[in-house]
Amino acid sequence: MSDPLRLRRAEATEPGVRALIAAQLAHGAEAAPETNDYTYGVAALSAPQVTIWALADSDTVAAIGALCDLGDGMAEVKSVHVAAAYRGQGLARRLMQHLHEAARAAGHRALVLETGSEALPGYDAARALYRGLGYGPCGVLPGYRDDPASAFFRLELA
């Protein structure tokens, strides 16, 4: 790593971002049933209602996360993923805290997200992170199925 990681806006088509999207898609394919994989690919993350942030140095994108504006004061957290070489350094928490700030600045009153349920151990760290940040369980989100492999969370923004 040549310099400290900085948070910046990113595009889904950037090579480093694309690499993390591919890694997240591979994780979803391995950790979740095919019928329960809601991971966004490059096209979905390029939609106008989606904003992506990256933690990166001049050479490497270490982590990504996105907000999808759902309207009515709500946004969905999407595609939070940390490259394997950077895990265990608190980058997901740092990125999530930035997403909270960005959502507040955009006028959102709440954030929602979907992740794998307790039935999918590959998502244990994600659930622990979200709970630790104050997210609580909520009902099924629009566009999702009621599925025992999904866990839905909501955070009211102050």
List each language-model region with its residue ranges.
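Short strand-loop junctions, especially beta-strand C-caps/beta-turns
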Residues: 80, 85, 114-118
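Conserved acetyl-CoA-binding loop-helix of GNAT-fold acetyltransferases
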Residues: 82, 88-105, 131-132
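Conserved GNAT acetyl-CoA-binding A-motif
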Residues: 103-118
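Accessory recognition modules or surfaces
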Residues: 89, 104, 122-129, 149-158
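A generic structural signal for beta-strand entry/edge sites
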Residues: 72-74, 110, 150
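Conserved active-site alpha-helix within GNAT-family acetyltransferase domains
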Residues: 93, 118-140, 146-148
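Short linear capping/connector segments at secondary-structure termini
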Residues: 37-40, 114-118, 147
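Acetyl-CoA-dependent GNAT
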Residues: 3-74, 78, 83, 96-97, ...
